[in-house]
Structures are given as C-alpha cells and as structure tokens.
Amino acid sequence: MAKITKTFQYGKHTVTLETGEVARQASGAVIVKMDDTVLLVTVVAAKTAREGQDFFPLTVDYQEKFYAGGRIPGSFFKREGRATEKETLISRLIDRPIRPLFPEDYKNEVQIIAMVMSLDPEIDGDIPAMIGASAALSLAGIPFKGPIGAAKVGYNDGQYILNPTVSELKKSQLELVVAGTANAVLMVESEAALLSEEVMLGAVIFGHREMQKVIQVIDSLTAEAGTEPSDWVPPAKNDALVIALKEVIGGRLSDAFHIREKLQRRDAIAAVKDDVIQQLAGRLEVEGWNLAELLKEFGELEYRTMRDALLDTKVRIDGRSLEAVRPITVKVGVLPRVHGSGLFTRGETQAIVVTTLGTARDGQVIDAVTGEYKENFLFHYNFPPYSVGECGRFGVQKRREIGHGRLARRGVLAVMPSLDEFPYTIRVVSEITESNGSSSMASVCGSSLALMDAGVPVKAPVAGIAMGLVKEGERFVVLSDILGDEDHLGDMDFKVAGTSEGVSALQMDIKIEGITEEIMRQALQQAKVGRLHILGEMDKALAAPRAELSDYAPRLLTIKIHPDKIRDVIGKGGSTIQAITKDTGTQIDIQDDGTIVIASVNNAAAREAKRRIEQITSDVEPGRIYEGKVAKIMDFGAFVTILPGKDGLVHVSQISSERVERVGDKLKEGDVVRVKVLEVDKQGRIRLSIKAVEEEVASI
C-alpha cells in the first residue's frame, strides 16, 4: 500500500495521519502528528479466537519513549521499564471508548500499542494516541464499529478551549477528555475547579461536536486505503438452547434478583446456574451444545431479567427507588496512631481511608519524559479480594486500582490547599474493605473525612456518587448510587464528585449508543441531589477540618534566610546542620531560595532548632552586648564566639579597665563572658570589648 497522508486543523494544532510507510506487517498502523508530538500506533488482530476463549482479549499499551523528550532514563538500566502511572492511565483512556464497539461474540485477540516517539512539551500524548488507535483499528479490517473521535476540553473566562496546551491547562478551570462515535458520547474523564453541572455538560457537548472532524478524516483515510470490511460472522443464536434454558430456569432467576443482600443473591443465582448445568448436561452432548454457549445464554437471561424488572416496576434489586441512596454510616478518628482516618460505609460498600502528613522530602519524584518533578499529594487505592468475598492475588497493583485511585484523587484535588498554605506532603490511602458498587466514590467520601480528621485545611467537604442507566428503546431509568450488579448489567457508569458548590470530577463510561443530552442532564441533576444528601450525612460526623493536627503528625516551622547564609547553616561538610538535627531530633529541609522547613513531632524541639538557625544566620550588630564563650587565648587578646560560626577579638586592652599583663591571668578557654561589639569592619572582622560592658554596667 502506498503512503497515504491526511492533514487537518484541530483547535490550534495541525494534526497529520499517515499510513502505508511504517509498521506495514501490523493489521493497522498509523503515525499521528500533533504539531511536534509524534506517535506510532499499531493494531494487530488474531485471525481466529483461541479455543475455549470466553472473553474479549483486548490489550492496550501506551508508552512514552524517553528519547521523545531528548532524555536518557534515570534508572539503573537506562531504558524504559514497566508502565508508569501516567502510561497506565492513558492506556485505560484509549481502552474504555473502543471496547464497547466490538461485537459481544468477538473473541479474537487484539493488541494496540501506542508509542510516543517525539514529544512537544506543550502537547501531551493522550489525544493523539486515542485518535491513532481509532484510525489503526479502522484500517485493520476487523469488526470495529468505529471510528471514534477524541477531544480535550479546557474552560477559562467562560469559554471552552479545544485541545488546550499544557500551559493553558495550568490556568484552566477544567480538564475534560471526551471520546465517542459520530452519534454518541462513549467516555468522559475530567477534573474541574468546582464547576456547575451545566458547564460540565456543555463541555461534553462541545467536545463531541468538535471531534466530528476527526471521525470524518479517519473515514476518508480508510476509504482511500481501500480497507476491506471484516469477514467475521457472529455465531448463530441457538434458539433451541435458549428455550431449554428458560424451561429449566422458570421464575427462579427473577426470584433470585428479589434477594436484597449481595452475597445471598450471588449464591442463589449460582445455585440456579449449577442446577441448570446439571439438568441440561445430558442434552449438551446429544444436541451438540457446548458449556460455554450455555453459560453465555444464561448470562444473557440474567441481563434481561434484571433490566426488564427494573424498567417494568421501577424498583431496584435491593428494594430502593430509582433516586434513593443506600444507608450511610460515617466515623472519623477510627485508627489511634495515624494522622487522620475515616470509615465510610454506604450499603455494602465500605472504605477505611487514612491520611498521613510528611515533609517536602517525602514527596514522590517522578522521572518523566519532559523532566523530573515532585508530587506532593499522593492518593493510593487498594482493592483486596476479600472486599468481594473472594480469594485472589494480594498486594499487586492492577490497572483498575490505579485508575480508581486517580479518579478519587481528582475528586478531592479542587479543595486541597496549596503548598504555600499547608507545606506538607500528603498521602491518602483508601482501603476498600467491602464492595458492592461505587468503591471509588466511597474513597472520595472517606478521603474527605480523613483529610479533615488530620487537620488538612480543605476548602470544603467532598462527596462522590455513581449513577447508572438502563435503557431499552425509548424507555429508560437513571439510577442513583448503583450496585455492582446494576453497573455490570446496566448501560452506563456515571461517577460525579464535588462539594455543595460544584463538580470536581466527572467520569462516564457508556456501553450503548443513543445517550441523549437530556439523559446526561437528568443524570447530573440526580447526582447533585444524591451528592448533597451524602454531604449532609458526612457533616454529622465531621463538618470541617480539625483545628489541631494529630499529636503524632509532624509540626512544621518555616523560616526564611538570605540565600547567601545557607552555607553557614549547612556548615563545613554538613557539620552544622547535622549537629542541629542530631541535638534536637528534628528534620530540616533547606531550599535554594533560603526557605528552611523544620519538622518535628515535638514543638519544643522544633523551636530550639529554629532558635539555633536564627542565631547562625543573624548579623552581628555593633553596639549590642552578647554573651559568648572564650574560644582561643592569644598573646594579644582572646577570641570569643558570640554566635555560631562568628568569633570576635577582645584585644588585651579591652579585657579590663586595669592593666592586663598576661591574657591568661584574666581569661581561660571555655569561660563565658559578656562582650560588647565595638565594630564590624569591611572584611567582617569583629572587635569586642569586655571593658565596655563593665563600664556600661558601672554607669547605671
């Protein structure tokens, strides 16, 4: 295939798609250029599915090459290693809108690799990667119901910004990524500075409208490339098996979905499934049916039973109305020795969240393609297998945990104090101890409580809620505070976090087309009502940050010195600073601009360290009387230390009003004496006098 190039303007940026020259053995390959950011995105699809494959094995890997930014990796091996958190998040960002566009029965392995090969510091690789994945899939000749478009939306001064630069995002009140087909929004990921629901919805609509240009260009690219449509044919539906299943199941699935407790409901459905397998085991061999086919059709009946009951009765699995939030219990200060903690329980979803305060040196150093930087607000989300009553691997962080942790972090970021306001490194850890839907939003609520319990001056409490949707034709219901089954069997997962004033984070994943603006508006308004209810419940436990930090949290004292005096505080070979930290038990951080932060759990120790630093850095004042220690005896006088690192000379003539023959007759090394500063000359030499102090005292 000859090289094909398509170029178009996308916001302020020029985007180019190229295919036919590089990676020609892949099923589909595209080079995407957005100004100076360049990615190679490839798709390889297996010709057939593995035997017995019962899920769609789609993998997406996004990688930023260090050479893209003109850097060599800082690791020991000097090469790219396992995926960073950013790479994992962008891999998920690519995956989420494309996965629903493959047929349910398609089980062939598909791998997407997006490599950033040149990186403009002002243009991140996420949007080009999503565009490239869409184009490469469209060229691959597989049953992909795309293409999709993707756009990033900023918001400043009442105006939406299409694909803002990194610099523009720093000033923006919004960072929102939206992806979808020509007719439908499929995915939204965002963080916001407490914006209204209308502004958030407007950003989604704006982004979807602008991305139409991307979809048109990809359609043009695939048409010119002459991509043959996929010859994959879905397996024929086994009507006889479906009839047999329905006869054996009867009304038992419907009865199981009336059980309100999750584990009992799960066990009841499993019992029905086991009985069905046992009853139909003989017919499987006779009719030529296979077990995988039976289990698939059983799952389809599960799906249909729950959805039909919900649409017909407007009553949910656990007996709630559509808008009702599950019962909430809130506790704070649940762990005695930590700096802040909260226990948030909503129905059968529960999180213990802990806040730890540290100093600036506890921040995480990130070795990124664009250079090193330090992260001082860390949020970690853990989802152990026991939280859903299962056995499984423990301690290995999965992509889902990274994604949920980042969403929860976005939820509280808008209310966090700046480093100038609260100069601590803050780590929040959410331990999910029970899960039946919306554990990431429980983490938002729990983190808000733990932060306030730790005394972090957040601007306002934050709560989060997950919304769902069940839609059949023109009939639909929007669900507040969804259960795990409602998420799994529903058409939308719509998470909203924020304060009473506005939205701080919005995440949406939609499995179907036909989600209208009106449905999204209803979901946002219903989420607001639920969020305010949850905030009210949280306020009963703790409505504002505690006035005092935990007794076990470090206290920080900050002082500012002239940068020229930093070397005095450090001392030769670090001797001075080491002595202070050892004597006082404090931790001291010195910045290049002269800012010194002293950290200690003991207030008195921190104050002593501060006093000693102020002594070292203070200037000697002529005319002032100091108490000093005799450091050295000379024939012509004595050197007296009046401040750390500052010695002055008391000439023999200034030791006493009487004549002094030998200095040693009056002074000895180690003597503590009071001296007056007579002069500090241009070379910084200090002249002192004991005699002047005696005369001054005598004159009073």
From Swiss-Prot:
UniProt domain KH: residue ranges: 554-613
Keyword Methyltransferase: no
Molecular function GO labels: 3'-5'-RNA exonuclease activity; magnesium ion binding; polyribonucleotide nucleotidyltransferase activity; RNA binding
Cofactor: Mg(2+)
Subcellular location: Cytoplasm
Subunit structure of this chain's protein: Component of the RNA degradosome, which is a multiprotein complex involved in RNA processing and mRNA degradation.
Gene coding for it: pnp
Name of the protein in its database record: Polyribonucleotide nucleotidyltransferase
Domain S1 motif: 623-691
EC numbers for this chain: 2.7.7.8
Role noted for this protein: Involved in mRNA degradation. Catalyzes the phosphorolysis of single-stranded polyribonucleotides processively in the 3'- to 5'-direction.
Source species of the chain: Xylella fastidiosa (strain M12)
Similarity-based family: Belongs to the polyribonucleotide nucleotidyltransferase family.
UniProt KW keywords: Cytoplasm, Magnesium, Metal-binding, Nucleotidyltransferase, RNA-binding, Transferase
Alphabetized Pfam families for the sequence: KH_1 (PF00013), PNPase (PF03726), RNase_PH (PF01138), RNase_PH_C (PF03725), S1 (PF00575)
GO CC term, one of those recorded: cytosol
